[in-house]
Amino acid sequence: MRAYNDLIVALKQCGALAVCDGFYVIGADEQAFTRNLVGDIYNLTAVNAPTYAADNYVAGNGTTSYYDTGANPTTMVSPKFVQDSAHLGIWSLTNNNNAGALSYDAGNANTFIARTAATSGGVTFRVNRTGSALATLPGYPGHIVVSRSASDLFKIWGNGTDIGGATTASTGVSNQTLRISDASGSLHGVNQIRAMHFGSHMTLAQAAAVNAALRAYASAIGAP
């Protein structure tokens, strides 16, 4: 419990929790993972029994299982996640792919983080747009954040560093809930995920602080 509380304190102190609509992290049981650290809203629902490994990770089966936040950007009340200020972040433990295809680790149709099969550490991502961009995260697996700060600018932060971005314009939020191990209900994931968060634009400094806080938490709970 102390490690959990220390994590929340660290996330508040760096300002990261204030920009989030949802923040989820692995714990001793699945119920702890499904609780939103931001508040009692958008708690996760397990769909078709995704894998839950206590104090370690969750994973989809690549076909039907995932966690649903219930947060639809078009219907959320006073959302921080909006068209031209939005982020999605995950902490992934694996560098594998979905049988040679993409592993969609989190998101929905217009905002997602997926793992490419072509390159070790390769990431395919988008933030409130219909086209995707590519980046490579040295030292992957790890913590990755895709964040849009303007209508014509979005960046990708990897393990607390700047690893790329694009100037492609936003096209709108998706009328779909944000999910873990899935994006849009037909794009599925298999990788091991230890944390996921989403909200308004997250700065590089905040992403670096989240990365450090998550790693300190994992060490404190004895995560493998």
Task: Name the predicted role of every residue range.
Residues 1-224:
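Polar, enzyme-active/binding microenvironments
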